[in-house]
């Protein structure tokens, strides 16, 4: 409903193929829909309400759980291409013909695949804390799903720098994640997280030729947002995206890691507003 928010939007479901997708939709209808694609081992409640509610003042916001994640049924795909196909099936099931997309980390990989392989579905693309196929340091040999056992500590370390200002932003962000008190999403299983990690690692393998050829296929206006001290997806990946995407602009936020858009939420929302206009 138009008057719903991140905190109040009901969790809905729709069948697409063999998956029952869980999703939420809020904000004014009529404008170009804005689909949000999430990061590794994250569900709908892991989006920052300051960001989603900020989007929803002017945009028809759609959150969705990937197959096997949160309340969505099915088995989580272990390749980005398969995750992308699942997202396409979901979008068609809810009647989307064209939309803007925000892809955060893993979601940004899916957004790139959407732009390259399903260009007619997209109008504009926003890539947050992500990297190109075959980017730098994207195989994540040292990352394991066991690190998810203490998600709060992991988020504080991965999303925010040690500076006092960044840590204060991190504490505020962690509190915001609690703002939805009812109808919360379901935690992500290790099996599903492992599948997503496999998808990211497959994406990160450097090809033997035409390393960034896929990016040349993405003609959509694209906004790249990154933290200058990101320890999850190294900042060099943002520059690679900006160099090889034909119609991209890059914003690098200072003193920021993987949660740059949440740490700098106010200015980020202004940048997004300008970009989507």
Locate predicted features.
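Hydrophobic, aromatic-rich cap/lid helix
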Residues: 184-211
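Catalytic active-site module of serine/aspartate enzymes centered on a nucleophile-bearing elbow/loop
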Residues: 248-277
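Flexible "cap/lid" loop of the alpha/beta hydrolase fold
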Residues: 112, 116, 123-153
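Short beta-strand/loop motif that positions the catalytic acidic residue
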Residues: 218, 224-226
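Conserved HGGG/HGGXW glycine-rich cap/lid loop of the alpha/beta-hydrolase fold
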Residues: 19-73
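Active-site loop/oxyanion-hole signature of alpha/beta-hydrolase fold enzymes
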Residues: 62-102, 270
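Gly/Ala-rich beta-loop-alpha elbow adjacent to hydrolase catalytic centers
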Residues: 103, 107, 111
């Amino acid at each position: 409903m138009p008057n719903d928010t991140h905190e109040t939007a009901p969790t809905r479901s729709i069948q697409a193929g063999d998956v029952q997708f869980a999703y939420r939709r809020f904000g004014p209808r009529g404008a170009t829909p804005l689909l949000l694609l999430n990061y590794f081992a994250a569900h709908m409640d892991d989006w920052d309400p300051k960001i989603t509610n900020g989007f929803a003042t002017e945009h028809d916001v759609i959150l969705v759980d990937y197959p096997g994640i949160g309340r969505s049924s099915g088995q989580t795909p272990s390749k980005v291409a398969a995750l992308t196909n699942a997202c396409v099936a979901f979008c068609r099931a809810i009647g989307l013909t064209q939309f803007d997309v925000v892809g955060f980390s893993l979601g940004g990989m899916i957004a790139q695949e959407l732009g390259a392989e399903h260009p007619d579905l997209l109008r504009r693309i926003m890539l947050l804390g992500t990297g190109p196929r075959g980017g730098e340091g994207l195989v994540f040999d040292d990352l394991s799903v066991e690190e998810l056992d203490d998600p709060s500590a992991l988020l504080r370390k991965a999303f925010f720098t040690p500076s006092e200002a960044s840590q204060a932003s991190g504490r505020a962000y962690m509190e915001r994640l609690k703002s939805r008190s009812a109808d919360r999403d379901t935690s992500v299983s290790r099996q599903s997280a492992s599948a997503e990690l496999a998808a990211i690692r497959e994406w990160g393998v450097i090809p033997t030729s035409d390393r960034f050829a896929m990016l040349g296929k993405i003609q959509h206006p694209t906004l790249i947002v990154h933290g200058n001290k990101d320890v999850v997806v190294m900042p060099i990946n943002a520059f690679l995206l900006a160099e090889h995407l034909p119609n991209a602009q890059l914003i690098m936020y200072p003193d920021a890691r993987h949660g740059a858009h949440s740490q700098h939420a106010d200015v980020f929302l202004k940048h997004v507003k300008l970009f989507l206009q």
